[in-house]
Amino acid sequence: MLRELMHARVSADLVVGSSVGAMNAAYFAGAPNAAGIDKLEKVWRGLRRHDVFPVTFRSVLGFMGGADNLIDPSNLRRLIEHNIPFPNLEDAPIPVHVVATNLGGATVCLSSGPTVEALLASAAIPAAFPSVHIGEHHLIDGAVGSNTPILNAADLGATRIIVLPTGFACALHEPPKGAIARALHALTLLIAHQMVRDLRQLGGKVDVFTIPNLCPLDVSPYDFSRADQLIEQTAGHTRKWIEGGGLSRPGDPEFSVAAYTLTLRWLPRVTLGRKYDSPAIAKTNNEEPVLADTDAESSNLEPINAM
């Protein structure tokens, strides 16, 4: 999606991200150009499940023995450190805001402070990864509070928002295998339902352009083996949407809600679940759209600095 938006000369005034989308947003904020997007694609094409979710026999035993989390975040930390060039959020070439959730369920927006800690907090899937202590908060995955960037982007002053949904496995024929796979699937479904809610809540107050997600889709977010296929399919899908005037006509909120609700109905009863992240492109008072990847209701947003 980012590749095709860049080809269409879409630029960003700010970036807001949650969960894995926060990592994509931070990477883009550090290299908001075609070369940066190409490198981001190469990162995703080269990832394997063990690079992010290194579940071992020892970790399973520890979890069964009372450990707080199943996965050691060291691999994820190294991945972030290796690929995100700015040490603090405020150092990014484009303003970037990372959304996480505190243990009370409130959404917390991190706009400054250590980048790695903020991204680890936003992607800290409960039970899978440990919570991250930042300031006065113990933070977990931003998707737990709200995972669509729409409301946060509007709260940050965006008047034009382009939503890049991660989508979800809407055509699985059986439940994902394994606890982590099911948790990820559950989170992706939650994002989709939150998007429907947020579109309704926004109610046409800003211009929202939602790139249609791939559906039917039968790939679990725990399956990294088909990254090449999904990247190219999504690029083609986005290109057709742009060529059809998608960037020139803001979507009617109720039409977007209806389209997403129809997509959700693809889900067989057996596939209950959800997770991952979605960047959005937003826009302030200038004429060009803005990339925003966030997820929180304005009433729940609690800005803090990551100290």
Protein language model annotation of sequence segments:
Residues 21, 112-215, 232-239:
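Conserved catalytic block of serine-dependent lipid acyl chemistry
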Residues 11-14, 105-106, 137-138:
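Short active-site oxyanion
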